[in-house]
């Protein structure tokens, strides 16, 4: 591979790297000499052998400034080549860069190009890998030129011949051997690398390309076209590798400085024959070291062994050729040489890999050195070890300020030693470096003073592994502490995900001035208070601090000093200190500022002040006029730390309130004030947690007395269910679901009662309740298990794919306070163990997801301010989502730029103008405005920047609440924001001890709020049935599939909530009535889908035959039978077919309605039975997802969405709007037709047994599913286009994070990733561009290719044009017009032309793995996965990596092109204000001194 870097050698600055196949000339140009012997070093002297693999003459001296024989020593002989031993006198570091070579006796094929899929050599020669292998490994001859003998025998070029056939021709035509090799009449056939070399050399790439394009255009055979396309891709790759170099002939060399280059060579692009090697490069010896161990043994790199085998076999082959050995022996030796070279380049590909002697492991070849986690890319280039760093255990430092950390003295002195030594010498305390070191070793007191001065104002960086997001590394101001542990501030623990049970952290020292500046300005912990993933604060008090603040601000009736009136906060403080009022006493205080409270002060006041008294009247007036506030002593103390501009916080401070408050502070008063506030409330929190002395005893867990009664009721209900099952009215599935339901409800009732009991205990001062209510520790779920009942337990799942685990139907009735019986204990161990094993297994999955996300988005950087697009994304107000606790409308538009004016449709007011940022205040007002149903916002998904994205489309940077700056690496932030909670999700299970949560299948649906009922698409029938008491009961039953009930505001008509009506639901309300909150709207059966009669008539079974399409299951306990439809295909012959369905006949026996019955349905009617509208004909059981809060279902779901996988058993989706009709029934499928009014018809074949959602005559829209199953994102893209699929992916991923884990991620981050998944298009028709059909290319490259030919025309008739103009060529329109003018002037025939045909394409949705591999950057893709494949393809095509992403720049050791590393900052120089000269002079200053200071203060000339 050749590295190229534009215009200057690698040691300077380079802007791109070109990959290509190394020609023999380039290998020789890099080489310093030929390695002739397999020896490495002399076993006695330990010095390298001459001409061996470690030879000093070739690779340079092993000691600095000393030749091999010792004739020249010392630096003064620099550059002299010793006349005795031939070694150049130079530094030993050249042994890291000087290469050698091995000249092979016969050409050898490079295994990468032969074994890669598809095989590059195979594609060029049109040979299969199997056939190639037989030629390369000397099994058959291949015909290179058939000549006359071949023609007579009917042998064509590339035919394979066995040895017998070959010798037969040779003996038959003896004079053939005398002809010259280039004579077209000579018969030539060879084998091995030599044959391949000759064949490849004879290929005319241009001719092959033309031929293959013709086949593509004209062939009717699909197979031929596929093969031609496969070959054409490789041919075009080789042709492309020439293109950029037609102008420049000389090519600078990457591996040497110019004065160091052995001999220039001209780079011509890749030639096919370069894939066969005549010389092999030998890498520098320092990169394959040989290290002496004790006891006279050596540790050596595997590469030395592999090179030795090549050299030994090569030398032996040369000798055999010299002595004219028999062909059989030669052939065997040549094959062994080929195998040795294969092993050297890629040992892992081979079935019989070369193994080591002792441990019998395969040797690590050159490819293995690059591949995988331990390979060069990931181990050494992306993850380097750093000096000036240390690590230690962390402990809490409660007295630290937010921006400080405690650094142990012993660690600090070690880290800052060079700086301390310099200070000691400068101040004259120590005479020399050596004596300064002695002072430090003695731990002289003066050293500590100097150290204090050195670290003053120098930030250090702390990092805790795993670093899942950018808050995992933060900068702090160090404080010297005794001991050996690092101290950290309690509030930064959340960001680091640290606790003090033995966690360790690493310390890094930023050395340069620029690094210190960035650390203290950008990375200081006090500047990182907001989570980039959601814009919410991360430095939130937790545990003791929350408990302390909650205890402090809670009120209690009857405390000492209740109802007293105070003049000011100071007065309250004095009274409290003098013990005249209690901490929780309700008092009145003069305050005329803004008050944040959520209670009615006058009503509370009347509970402890006589309402009719004069005092009460006066207080009422004061409270009304907002001149006084009713509060508690504790809240007054708390508010002394709140900045005045925020007002008086008159609420109980729990974790949620604290989080809101910190969020408000950071946006309203800035980070400095917020950091002060945080430090203050930390002190307050800890202090009052101590004052309260809150601890939990066994007596604090109170079990409600009513528990026994509820359990008795539940046991009664479950017995009733079992009885019904025994009577045969329920299936086993329904029995199970109903029993689980009964216990789930009981469990929830008991939990609620125990919670309420705790709440009432000691006026809410029960320590357990306070911990729970404040959010300090524990959850309602845990309280339920302590004082209620443990409830139902999930069975552990077998599969990892996230199928729901069954729930054990016998609940655990005891709670943890009462203690479990042996059986209960045994059942509950299930969940506990599963939690632990899950945690360890899933962390790896989440980590891998994060890695793929990083790789796909690492080059998304904000590059420009505005891309100027007119497109935007429509965000709708979705009532269902908002009321079910998902992301609100305001959250979706907050921090975005409006694409169009947002107008209140009721008043016509413009709320936000196009191009304006929607701030938090604006978003709130839009949320409250009923007249705004949707808003069009700028989005990353519609951004049209060519490279990266623009800041207007991204919107605000969530962590600073301002428009994102140019240079922000938003891709990496997006990947971190999605990956970090992914790891959190994983660790979700074990807190519940495996207790089952999830759907109580609610059979009654109640109104969410007061309002008016409005039916939408509701079709019903009245149905009379017997109720449990034997009385007649008339019910209204829904018979339409997609009906809805809306609840609207009766005055404004605004939609408040929407409910989907299930098929077969019983309505409990009427259209247009007013309902109250929690009034029942409808009842439905949650565990099955019902098939309901819509008309009266008689049932007839069609294709429902016992033992064929249904089985009769007689329940052994009850003796009742149940008819279940079965998969009948297993019972019938291949030609037969069945379609089970129920028919409703009228009196004349005519069919009025047909109902297909899917497999697994249970029939509820008999053949010939009379039915009425609303009768249940059959039930199709649903699989209910009743698993505990286990994200197992979540993580695979997220992965499936990001990888754009087609779900198992996807739904069939209609491609057009139209009406459904059913067609013919085949053996294994039935036809569904969708036809529209324009006569367009689409036919779909549905597998028998799949549940069809659409009925005959139903109207469907494009994109509606016709059958059950998950919709495939690929279908959405095909039918509804890229916008729909982008929205679908973002919403679905959000749902998983929201519902499964309650994690908030801003849509922006998901949009960035989804944008990357849709960056590519697939070429349909290439037109006149040089693209290939089926090519996958970047959308911008596609637009560019079309733009390039937009001004060109294709010549259809050349007329009397000059010879350079031929038919079917492309030329610029203006050139041809000019030429035609000339031709017309000379009365000649003009050129006829037509416009060049543009290419057409369709968008492609790639999963994140393939999107990361398809990236434009070779280096980035190679370091991600499939390293050899990526590099092989890049080398063949002569690809250039322009180093635009972050990863490739890290790998080549440059600053990343983001943040302060942006290119435009390189040429900026800081100039003092008074001395700033005219701009021209500044430019001169800049260009001369640009090297000196890479840091930026002020932008001057670019």
UniProtKB/Swiss-Prot annotation:
Keyword Zinc among record annotations: yes
Annotated keywords: DNA-directed RNA polymerase, Magnesium, Metal-binding, Nucleotidyltransferase, Transcription, Transferase, Zinc
Enzyme class: transferase
Gene Ontology cellular component list: DNA-directed RNA polymerase complex
Domain of life: Bacteria
Binding site for Zn(2+) 2: 867, 943, 950, 953
Cofactor(s) for this UniProt protein: Mg(2+); Zn(2+)
GO MF terms, alphabetically ordered: DNA binding; DNA-directed RNA polymerase activity; magnesium ion binding; zinc ion binding
GO biological process: DNA-templated transcription
Record-linked InterPro entries: DNA-dir_RpoC_beta_prime, DNA-dir_RpoC_beta_prime_bact, RNA_pol_asu, RNA_pol_N, RNA_pol_Rpb1_1, RNA_pol_Rpb1_3, RNA_pol_Rpb1_3_sf, RNA_pol_Rpb1_4
Cofactor binding annotation: Binds 1 Mg(2+) ion per subunit.
One Pfam family linked to the record: RNA_pol_Rpb1_5
EC numbers: 2.7.7.6
Binding site for Mg(2+): 499, 501, 503
Catalytic activity of the protein: RNA(n) + a ribonucleoside 5'-triphosphate = RNA(n+1) + diphosphate
Binding site for Zn(2+) 1: 67, 69, 82, 85
Its biological purpose: DNA-dependent RNA polymerase catalyzes the transcription of DNA into RNA using the four ribonucleoside triphosphates as substrates.
Quaternary state and interactors: The RNAP catalytic core consists of 2 alpha, 1 beta, 1 beta' and 1 omega subunit. When a sigma factor is associated with the core the holoenzyme is formed, which can initiate transcription.
Family: Belongs to the RNA polymerase beta' chain family.
Name this polypeptide is given: DNA-directed RNA polymerase subunit beta'
Source species taxonomy: Bacteria, Pseudomonadati, Chlorobiota, Chlorobiia, Chlorobiales
Gene that this polypeptide is encoded by: rpoC
